[in-house]
Amino acid sequence: MPGTKPVELGSLKVGQYIVIDEVPCRIVDMTKSKPGKHGGAKIRLTAMGLFENVKKEHVGPTSSRADVPLIDKRKGQVLSIMGDLVQIMDLETFDTLEIPMPEDVEEIDSGMEVEYFEAVGRYKITRVISK
């Protein structure tokens, strides 16, 4: 999957990111079982989606590989609000993006600076920096 890198499941920790069923997620719970008589150690991950509020679970051996999304955090200025879309200008590259209006971020207005991230080709506003 583009925009990801493979890592071993055993190296992941709570709070890190993983792609489960092509959905980028943040790990919220993780349990490791010890190796037994008939096999290696297993990991059970519980994760919440970054873009949709969905709960995902994954079980696998600690030596198996999983994709981790490459997350790019950036700052931008709100140019306009068009219904449920926010038009943002990136403050480094001056590119213009249209990002869905977040539900969990306080009131957003034109001219505000916001922090957003890009993962697996999708964007999300995370917080308002200045008003």
Swiss-Prot record:
It comes from the Archaea. InterPro entries: IF5A-like, IF5A-like_N, NA-bd_OB-fold, Rib_uL2_dom2, Trans_elong_IF5A_hypusine_site, Transl_elong_IF5A_arc, Transl_elong_IF5A_C, Translation_prot_SH3-like_sf. Keywords: Cytoplasm, Hypusine, Initiation factor, Protein biosynthesis. GO terms for cellular component: cytoplasm. It holds the Pfam family IF5A-like_N. Its main location: cytoplasm. The modification Hypusine is found at K37. GO terms for biological process: positive regulation of translational elongation; positive regulation of translational termination. GO terms for molecular function: ribosome binding; RNA binding; translation elongation factor activity; translation initiation factor activity. SUPFAM superfamilies: Nucleic acid-binding proteins, Translation proteins SH3-like domain. It is found in: Cytoplasm. Gene3D superfamilies: 2.30.30.30, Nucleic acid-binding proteins. PANTHER family: TRANSLATION INITIATION FACTOR 5A FAMILY MEMBER. Functions by promoting the formation of the first peptide bond. Belongs to the eIF-5A family. This is Translation initiation factor 5A. It comes from Methanococcus aeolicus (strain ATCC BAA-1280 / DSM 17508 / OCM 812 / Nankai-3).
